[in-house]
């Protein structure tokens, strides 16, 4: 009798788990009509790249720092940043204290081999001269011409739009577990 009762309990428990589990699977299946993503964590060949930077605000250089850092982790090759927007004021020595955090980040990239080239035309239009700029900056004749030149030498063009993705999941799903501590 005990054996039969134990068997019945086990059978009911297993049936319940199967039904309960399949209810969850059925409930979530409408959220996965295309299945789930595959991973392809392949290595990249050596690729030289040129970043076309024309930002409205120096603070947007933080996104550039993240772009370059992340790409350089997985893609070998040379990195050149061509600056020709309002962000150039961050590199003026007179503004160092105001933009110290971001300039120090850019200088750390320069120490790791990233080249920073600044458009002479943009620099003059902003009211600066080469002697006003930080020492890791190289002033070049024209930003767009430099980009064209580097592309002709095999560099790949990157336009790093400073749109952050951090916490973007929380915009559509504020109840997601990763969002709870960010409220």
Please describe what each predicted stretch is.
Residues 25-183:
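Secreted/extracellular ectodomain signature
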Residues 9-19:
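Bacterial N-terminal signal peptides
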Residues 1-10:
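Bacterial N-terminal signal peptides that target proteins for export
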């Amino acid at each position: 009798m005990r054996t039969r009762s134990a068997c019945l309990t086990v059978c009911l428990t297993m049936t319940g788990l199967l039904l309960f589990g399949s209810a969850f699977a059925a409930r979530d299946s409408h959220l996965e009509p295309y299945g789930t993503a595959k991973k392809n964590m392949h290595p990249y060949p050596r690729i030289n790249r040129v970043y076309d930077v024309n930002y409205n605000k120096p603070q947007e250089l933080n996104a550039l720092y993240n772009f370059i850092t992340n790409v350089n982790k997985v893609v070998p090759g040379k990195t050149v940043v061509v600056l020709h927007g309002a962000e150039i004021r961050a590199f003026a020595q007179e503004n160092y204290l105001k933009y110290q955090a971001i300039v120090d980040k850019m200088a750390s990239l320069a120490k790791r081999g990233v080249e920073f080239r600044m458009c002479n035309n943009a620099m003059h239009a902003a009211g600066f001269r080469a002697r006003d700029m930080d020492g890791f900056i190289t002033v070049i004749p024209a930003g767009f011409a430099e980009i064209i030149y580097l592309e002709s030498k095999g560099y790949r063009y990157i336009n790093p739009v400073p749109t952050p993705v951090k916490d973007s999941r929380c915009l559509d799903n504020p109840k997601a577990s990763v969002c709870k501590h960010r409220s």
